[in-house]
Amino acid sequence: MSVVGLDVGSQSCYIAVARAGGIETIANEFSDRCTPSVISFGPKNRTIGVAAKNQQITHANNTVSSFKRFHGRAFSDPFIQKEKESLSYDLVPMKNGGVGIKVMYMDEEHLFSVEQITAMLLTKLKETAENNLKKPVTDCVISVPSFFTDAERRSVLDAAQIVGLNCLRLMNDMTAVALNYGIYKQDLPNADEKPQGSGVCGHGPSSFQVSACAFNKGKLKVLGTAFDPFLGGKNFDEKLVEHFCAEFKTKYKLDAKSKIRALLRLHQECEKLKKLMSSNSTDLPLNIECFMNDKDVSAKMNRSQFEELCAELLQKIEVPLHSLMEQTHLKTEDVSAIEIVGGATRIPAVKERIAKFFGKDVSTTLNADEAVARGCALQCAILSPAFKVREFSVTDAVPFPISLVWNHDSEETEGVHEVFSRNHAAPFSKVLTFLRRGPFELEAFYSDPQGVPYPEAKIGRFVVQNVSAQKDGEKSKVKVKVRVNTHGIFTISTASMVEKVPTEEDDGSSVEADMECPNQKPAESSDVDKNSQQDNSEAGTQPQVQTDGQQTSQSPPSPELPSEENKIPDADKANEKKVDQPPEAKKPKIKVVNVELPVEANLVWQLGRDLLNMYIETEGKMIMQDKLEKERNDAKNAVEECVYEFRDKLCGPYEKFICQQEHEKFLRLLTETEDWLYEEGEDQAKQAYIDKLEELMKMGNPVKVRFQEAEERPKVLEELGQRLQHYAKIAADFRSKDEKYNHIDESEMKKVEKSVNEVMEWMNNVMNAQAKRSLDQDPVVRTHEIRAKVKELNNVCEPVVNQPKPKIESPKLERTPNGPNLDKKEDLEGKDNFGAEAPHQNGECHPNEKGSVNMDLD
């Protein structure tokens, strides 16, 4: 079972896996642990990751990047419209109103959804993990920003389904970092002590996030989160790009924004300059050759100028920090440490701002790039039964308050209830009780739309169906379980109706029914039961309302009854009571049955099953096309490699092993094949390259074999000669009556001599025949035949010459007629020669009175 953590970022991705030795971040086929979030489309296949990044400038229109923030958003979203202006590829609306990405693929115009694009990236990450683990990858944990809304999270899950990944949990970035930070710490307080407060701050390419966490041994709880979704390292790059665009326009009369390729090159150079300024405070140059119109451009900047240019962005860093302190009611001294991760935290000014706010130095104990992926892998290992991990519970926080609105039964007024407040523990479930006579709707929405970085506050509409009134006409009690699950997604998981069914029982049972009925009747004064059930099982606590319900359903005996009536009467009094009192009529007992109700969900964003299946089928076809194209390219490269290899060696080591006529013929074939490769064979089917390779190998293989045989044959013949000399010497020693071999039977040694003579004669004949042949002729014997002879010789001779000598038994010691041999120590211990027991010695085993054995140890 695979345990994989995927950090899918807007600019790059990291993969962490769990092994027996711990968590490891794995590398891709380029030996790089960072895989760019870039996908390039070509006429034959897709290119994903490093290879796509390398051709981003040359294939700008068909190379897709920075698409993570498009999840779950409509094309009309203001954020999409703003981002559209700075992209090198086209965004168009989909039929469902979502964002579509238009590219040229397989020489045709294709429209892909954001889920499909992310699925393509996940396909690459999955392939990299499988190549590293050498087994299929299915289960994983994927990271998302903590400010992702319900629609965005559902969109990411759909992308994982397209590629066949079972996402065990969508984990918030900072929660993953906190898990990676806390699980290895040994100085955490015990569970019953005051938790240790720590802050986790992440500043990546596209956003700034910070979380306050409480740590105990084996426990992590996120107290609150704050963020700026539009403050990332990319914004600092944009400031540099704007500055140099203005400078080049004034200095060189060049408008970099008019050409997308020039703008992309400037973006790359500005990113490099920003990284250099993080470690150097002096003036640093920016040089780009042939920038536009065959003109070279140059400029320079230092760190102080950069900080002055980005002063507005640096001021925004403190806003989420202040917000976090207000939400959690913490003081800066309550935060014992602040761990920072993300590429943008390497900017010295960013570190200084964070350290100044908290009044302490920031901590950089974690790998700033890989911390999120490692935290996701740890969470996956905790959830997986295949790994035994230290117990560590993770309680996340709901980033936005969620409310429910519904119509009352009269349909004249609406009821609103905030079911999950900001920073409420998650995953978490609550049970709401409604009194209804028919089906009703619940609408979930974010209570604070201004604080949500998403234009739509609505989450979805849920219809509870098959609700009916009780048989007596009263309203039915409907229990609705609302939940924020492990992915941070709001849902109505179940709904049930409490139905009363009258049954007839004996007198004792009817008394029990009378006791239960009042407590089971829902309160008419409140439409929603304020004592709603809260299921904290996933957060580590026990459900409370189940206990409360048990206490209310079983009423205690009334204290007004005299104590004698609580006693069990004797048989005579019971018989008298039966005779005196007339039989009472049977009272109906109310039996309570919970009926499960279907819930229809109409969500703001969720791919339909048919559309999802179509995307899965499309992705499968593209994966197969990529595989076929890779095999075709491999076959083509094999032909090209063969041409270059034989051409170089025919004028070198292979020259002696081919005749002049064949040499000229083979060279002509190599030249013709090379010309064919770059002309007619530039784009051929896989089989055409296989046929060409077979044609080349038909002429080249014999030459290659002759060369290899000439290199290996002397070594193998020398080995055979050494074995023959070894066995011949042993036979000679046997004939000279050497004591070492006098135990070997005469007939056995004759077999050795016969085998040695036969193999020696064969070797002499082969060597004489080979000496008469030239190097450009096929050899008389192959090296594998000589090795077979060596093996055959060893099989015959080794069992004979390695026969062990029989062991010679030493003569038994003679005992003196007068008693034991006093020269031998063992005769003085244990029993003597006549069977008498020796006296007990210290350190010996001897039976005690009960017959058991006592061990006296020195």
Swiss-Prot record:
Residue stretches of biased makeup (Polar residues): 533-549
Gene3D superfamilies given in the database record: 1.20.1270.10, 3.30.30.30, 3.30.420.40, Actin, Chain A, domain 4 (3.90.640.10), Substrate Binding Domain Of DNAk, Chain A, domain 1 (2.60.34.10)
Pfam families for the chain: HSP70
Example GO biological process: cellular response to heat
Tissue: Predominantly expressed in the brain and also found in the liver.
Modified residues (Phosphothreonine): 816
N6-acetyllysine carried by residues: 471
Keyword match Nucleotide-binding: yes
Compartments in which it is found: Cytoplasm
An annotated Gene Ontology molecular function: adenyl-nucleotide exchange factor activity
Highest taxon of source: Eukaryota
UniProt PTM: Phosphorylation on Ser-509 may be important for regulation of the HSPA8/HSC70 chaperone activity.
Bias type Acidic residues, positions: 504-515
Annotated segments matching region Disordered: 500-585, 801-858
GO cellular component: cytosol; nucleus
Keywords for this protein: Acetylation, ATP-binding, Cytoplasm, Nucleotide-binding, Phosphoprotein, Stress response
Positions of modified residues (Phosphoserine): 509-510, 558, 810
Matching InterPro entries: ATPase_NBD, Heat_shock_70_CS, HSP70_C_sf, HSP70_peptide-bd_sf, Hsp_70_fam, HSPH1_NBD
Biased composition (Basic and acidic residues): 564-585, 806-815, 822-834
N-acetylserine found at: 2
Subunit-level organization: Interacts with HSPA8/HSC70. Interacts with HSPA1A (via NBD) and HSPA1B (via NBD).
Function: Acts as a nucleotide-exchange factor (NEF) for chaperone proteins HSPA1A and HSPA1B, promoting the release of ADP from HSPA1A/B thereby triggering substrate release. Prevents the aggregation of denatured proteins in cells under severe stress, on which the ATP levels decrease markedly. Inhibits HSPA8/HSC70 ATPase and chaperone activities.
This protein's name: Heat shock protein 105 kDa
Protein encoded by which gene: HSPH1
